[in-house]
């Protein structure tokens, strides 16, 4: 279960689209970037709308932060940027006028294939179910805010069932005597 709910499907940002294109200017060159977001999920907390971009993939696609750092595979990041910079008025009208700002919650590739997990033929149902869930785990980049992650996946205590995260409890130290959860990339 999740507090994030779908708020847009096939959202077009382009000239004449649902939102304007993303415009990047450098010296005398201006580039307009257009696209269509498969799904946008939102979660409202204290006047802030947290947005998560979902991109459906039928093949195996995984998110690579090094690709983003090298200027490759920027699609989902550009979508989230477009929503954050241009989406406030749209979502005030669509959801509630009480919104003050949009904050990024994450970007995820979502597998949409029926998976047949690798393994032995004679697997019990529980093992098979666990292998299928693992194959359907999303890939992406998420906020490191524990409250936002818990809003994305209720009951998140260790490794995410569908989210690519793992929570660990940090050991108490002299500076911080209380154990605290830490986020680790999976």
Q: Which stretches of residues belong to each language-model region?
A:
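Structural signature of nuclease core domains in nucleic-acid processing machines
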Residues: 1-186
């Amino acid at each position: 279960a999740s507090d994030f709910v779908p708020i847009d499907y096939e959202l077009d940002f382009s000239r004449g689209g649902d939102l304007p294109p993303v415009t990047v200017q450098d010296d005398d060159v201006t580039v307009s970037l257009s696209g269509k977001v498969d799904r946008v999920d939102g979660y409202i907390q204290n006047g802030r709308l947290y947005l998560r971009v979902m991109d459906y993939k039928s093949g195996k696609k995984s998110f690579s932060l090094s690709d983003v750092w090298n200027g490759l595979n920027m699609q989902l990041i550009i979508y989230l940027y477009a929503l954050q910079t241009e989406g406030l008025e749209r979502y005030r009208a669509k959801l509630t006028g009480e919104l003050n700002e949009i904050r990024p919650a994450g970007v995820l590739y979502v597998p949409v294939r029926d998976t047949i997990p690798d393994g032995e033929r004679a697997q019990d149902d529980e093992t098979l179910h666990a292998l299928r869930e693992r194959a359907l785990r999303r890939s992406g980049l998420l906020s490191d805010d524990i409250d936002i992650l818990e809003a994305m996946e209720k009951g998140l205590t260790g490794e995410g069932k569908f989210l690519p995260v793992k929570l660990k409890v940090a050991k108490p130290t002299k500076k911080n005597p209380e154990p605290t959860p830490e986020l680790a990339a999976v």
